Amino acid sequence: MKPIVMIILENCPHCKNARRWMEEHKEEKPQYQVLQVEMIDEKLHPEVIQTYSYYYVPTYYVAGVKVHEGVPTKEIVCSVFEQALSKN
């Protein structure tokens, strides 16, 4: 299992949707329940996000590699989870 980092802004509507979809996926697919997502709010932790390269939130990194940036869909969130579970 690979680590997931999600960069967000607290009041971002797209971030709220992504968080809701993450919870829905975890309820629908038991294999996703083991996944831990480290959420970093760029406003609260500007010193941490300086090490990441992105323009839009939410942005997902899996094992240190950016896998999605910007407006997500439920399918994109599923893809992020699948990448975190993959052996490659």
In which residue ranges do the predicted regions lie?
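Local sequence-structure signature of Cys/Sec-based thiol-disulfide redox active-site neighborhoods
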Residues: 1-28
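Generic recognition of short, well-ordered alpha-helical segments
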Residues: 17-20, 51-52, 72
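Non-catalytic interaction surface on structured domains
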Residues: 20-22, 31-33, 76-77
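Structural micro-motif
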Residues: 51-61
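Non-catalytic, surface beta->alpha helical segment in thiol-disulfide oxidoreductase systems
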Residues: 61-88
